[in-house]
Amino acid sequence: MKIVAHRGYSGKYPELSSLAFEKALDLPIHGVECDVRLTRDGKVVVQHDPTLDRTAGRPGRISKLDWEELRGVDIGRGQRMMLLDELLELLEGKPHHLYIETKHP
């Protein structure tokens, strides 16, 4: 059996944020799970929902926005949305597995 932090340490920190992943990696787990979506300009962002409504409290569909429009959006406690590349950098050199679920617009 493998223990995986779903959306990072999402029970305590804003889901899918760098803080949630950093804190999850401090736990005795085997890996982390994330969801990814494409922005209008083709960037791969770490985001579960198709819109910003629930996580950021504002309207906006991920697939209809460019990364420049999304990069500054607060997803809770001052945390910002991540690119998949940023999450990969965070995990580099660590023994943890990364489970990626792709989402569609």
Model segments located where?
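Phosphate-group recognition and catalysis centered on beta-loop-alpha active-site segments
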Residues: 1-105
